[in-house]
Amino acid sequence: MMPFLCSLASGSSGNALLVVSAGARVLVDLGLSQRRLKTGLKAAGTAPDEIDAVLLTHTHTDHFFTAAVGFCLEHQVPVYSAEENLRHLSRSLAGFRELGKAGLARAINGGTLQIGDLAVESFDVPHDSHGRALGFRLAFGPTRRRRTVAVATDLGHMPGECLRWFVDANAVVLESNHDAEMLRASGRPWNLIERIAGPWGHLSNEAAADALAEIVGRSHPGRVASIILAHLSKDCNTPQLALEAQAHLAHGRTHPIRFLAAAQWAVGPRIEV
């Protein structure tokens, strides 16, 4: 079986990304009910008992909440995240301490985490969650055919120290949250608009396009094969607008790039890595 990734859900109502290699199956975030999760996993050809780990980006409830605790306890799935995030969830999320008691809440303290044949590295991203917000770079396969996936779904801007983790990734999963004009005209309270558009909020389509242009420009030709636009706002964005913002990257390339806008309520296709 070819390694692949599959978005089970992406957005403010819940997030989960499945990454499958030859020797491991992991979820990046688990912000879904058990029913939605199991339905999504089945659609992606994966059983709950096959999940080896959850990589938690940050502590907001659309990325991890009470139902995830029950799933991880039932199927003995470890949750890896920053120590600060584990401490916060132990205080704020019902049942999370039970994961700690079961040895399933495990801190990422830098370096490389090995899960089966997946080598996982984490990096800090700018987002206004309690604890630390993380992105992940996952690598697998033999040295000469090494494949990589880089993920960051909630970040207010793309500093250089974050961007470097995406260079030469075969698959990039990056937030493209809102259209700036739709956000300004949304009728939301101005302080919320400022928070979303601010440097610790969420990437606009335009900011995502700028970051992706630099990522592709700094990568070896043909290395970036797939780009998944994530965490689209249901009120202040559309898949069409998010994809149109990337049009300059999609056309006229010697090595074509596949673009996909991840959906909130539909399981995405398998993207081979």
Name what the model sees in each region:
Residues 60-64, 87-89, 130, 157-160, ...:
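Active-site environment of divalent metal-dependent phosphoester hydrolases
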Residues 65-75, 90-93, 237-244:
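Metal-dependent catalytic neighborhoods of phosphoester/phosphodiester hydrolases
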Residues 35-81:
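Active-site metal-binding motif and surrounding structural segment of the metallo-beta-lactamase
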Residues 160-262:
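Cap/insert and terminal regions of metallo-dependent hydrolase folds
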Residues 45-47, 95-100, 144, 218-221, ...:
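Short helix-capping segments at alpha-helix termini
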Residues 1-44, 132-154, 171:
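Conserved beta-strand hairpin/beta-sheet module of binuclear metal-dependent hydrolase folds
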